[in-house]
Structures are given as structure tokens and as C-alpha cells.
Amino acid sequence: MQRIIDREIEKTIDMKRLGQLVPPYCVVRQYDNIRGKTLKAVMGKYTVLILLWNIHDKRHRTLDKPGHFFVISTRGPEPCVVFSSTGMTPKKELFITQSDPTLLERILPKGTVYNNKKLQINRNSNTCWRFAILYAHLAPMGLKKFQSLFTHPSVHLSNS
């Protein structure tokens, strides 16, 4: 059973297939290819946007390595949410991927809420797309409720 789980965890996904697995209010794009001066211009008619950060070298050339999917949502109770399964700030992830940080700085509105809970517990980079699909479908519930789905309740045992 563990072999099956390990094999499934290793599976990657391409952007076309990912786009087929998300709700109609969601679109999947490459971070490097989005254009627009505002979040509304970038998202168009969609309320959830899954973006792929490609990995770059220090000269900002795209490398042939798996990237990282993250989500921007205006669909839930919060005005705008940036969700990454790593729980890292976009600034840190952009530094790791060597992607252009000015794009997010330019389009994200004030008051944007960021996921700071680490949900991707293994070091496998192929896990993020699964969380992106989940968040895309469940974005209407909001970030806090989504995070609570992955929080273990504390159990207290007593012998009285």
C-alpha cells in the first residue's frame, strides 16, 4: 500500500490537465506569461486563478524543472486570498523560484490575505497541484475554514 501511495505522490500534472479538473470559475496560467496592471485585468471573468511559478536560474532563464502552483482567489469571504500549500510568503517563494517579484506586488490589492499554514508536509514538489485543485473548489468557504479541514482536533483522555 505504501508503494502505491508513494507512486501517486510522485505524479506530476500539466497545466492543460489541471485546467480540466478545476471549476468553471477558475483559470490556470503561467506566472511568467500573465499581463495586466490590476488583479481584475489579470483574472478577467474568473474569480480563482491558479498560477505556475517556473523555476529560473540567477539570470531569470526558465529551467526545465518542476515549478510550484499557487492560487489567487477573490471568490471567498475575504476580498483576496493568496494560497500556497507551503505556507510561505509569495516573496520567499518568488526568491526560491527566481521569478519576477514585481508582478504580484503590482496586482495584489491592499488587504490581501495569505495562507501561512504549511499544508504540504513532504518535500515533494508534486503535491502543490493537489492543494491548488482543492482550494479552487473550496475557495467559496474562505481560507480559515479551508485551513481548519487540515487541523487535527486535540483529544483529551481522562481515566475518571
Predicted regions and their residues:
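Cysteine protease catalytic domains with a Cys-His-Asp triad
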Residues: 1-80
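Contiguous terminal or domain-adjacent regions
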Residues: 30, 115, 135-160
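Short amphipathic alpha-helical segments and helix-helix/interface helices
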Residues: 39-40, 101-105, 158-160
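Cysteine protease-like catalytic core of ubiquitin/ubiquitin-like
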Residues: 47-144
